[in-house]
Amino acid sequence: MLQVYLVRHGETQWNAERRIQGQSDSPLTAKGEQQAMQVGERARSLGITHIISSDLGRTKRTAEIIAQACGCDITFDSRLRELDMGVLEKRQIDSLTEEEEGWRRQLVNGTQDGRIPGGESMQELSDRVHAALASCLELPQGSRPLLVSHGIALGCLVSTILGLPAWAERRLRLRNCSISRIDYQESQWLASGWVVETAGDVSHLDAPALDELQR
């Protein structure tokens, strides 16, 4: 059985500003750096052997901090990037026009052909993150990889493993530096292949998540 751990990047400046990131970027906040350190401590205890990260700055920095703690090399994979949010990237959510908010809500509410102008569809996102995950099956026997990616990307990955369509309503919360685990296995009681063991674990973090503070 192959265990793969999934980590969302640490809190960023644009997360705090409620700004749409997509494939644009902003640095980790001091809290985000601390979150990544706490993931690193957990990763060391889990016996992580490989770190594979999105090549965007916020995930690279998160991966670097984790790697320092567990002594792993990092491989960067652009297929783990966040959903391309097109013309809405860098915008604060509260500044969107009614039409622009409609584009964004299509992705949240589950619209099969939803796509922000200039961006990509959820199916395109799903195809590339699943391809990145499949590459883990080529790692040496006994490997225990950790993937560092993004909220929408990882939510789509976990949801589709559970059998939902890529464009399904977004109902899985993966907070900054949450840890999820998926396994590749043959089982008499579960469908063979990828299964979800845990999703969105934040028990290793010692401070409230940003979305809890913004309620």
From Swiss-Prot:
Family: Belongs to the phosphoglycerate mutase family. GpmB subfamily.
Keywords tagged on the record: Glycolysis, Isomerase
Binding residue positions for substrate: 8-15, 21-22, 58, 60, 82-85, 104-105, 151-152
SMART domains with a match to the protein in the record: PGAM
Protein name: Probable phosphoglycerate mutase GpmB
Pathway membership, UniProt: Carbohydrate degradation; glycolysis; pyruvate from D-glyceraldehyde 3-phosphate: step 3/5
A GO MF term: phosphoglycerate mutase activity
